[in-house]
Amino acid sequence: MGKKKKEKLSVAREIDGMEEKVALCKYNLDVIDVKLRKMELTEEGRKSLEKEKSSLSSRLSNYERELKSLRHENRKNMLLSVAIFLLFAVGYYCWTL
C-alpha cells in the first residue's frame, strides 16, 4: 500500500513531506542533545537517549539521501518539461512562418 500512496503523490509533494520529516528529525536530535548535556541522567537513561540519538541520526541520513534523490528526479522532470515546451515553441514558430 505504501507504493500506491507514493505513486499518487507528485514529486514536489514528496519533497515537501520529506523536508518535514528531515526538520522533525533535526528538532528531535536537538532535543536529545539538550537532554544529554543539561540533564543529570542515570547510566541507563543516558544509554537509552544515546541509542535513540543514533537511531534518529541514521533515520535522518536516510531521509536526506531520499530527499537528494527526489530533488534529482524533480530536476529531471523540470528539464523534460522545458524540452517539451521548447519543442512545441519551435513547432509553432515553424508552422506560423
From Swiss-Prot:
Organism this protein belongs to: Xenopus tropicalis (Western clawed frog)
Main location: membrane
InterPro entries named in the record: CCDC-167 (IPR028194)
Places the protein is found: Membrane
PANTHER family for the chain: COILED-COIL DOMAIN-CONTAINING PROTEIN 167
Primary gene name: ccdc167
Bilayer topology annotation: Single-pass membrane protein
Protein name per UniProt: Coiled-coil domain-containing protein 167
A single Gene Ontology CC term: membrane
Residues annotated as transmembrane: 78-95
Source organism superkingdom: Eukaryota
The entry's keywords: Coiled coil, Membrane, Transmembrane, Transmembrane helix
Pfam families with a match to the protein in the record: CCDC-167 (PF15188)
Coiled coil: 36-80
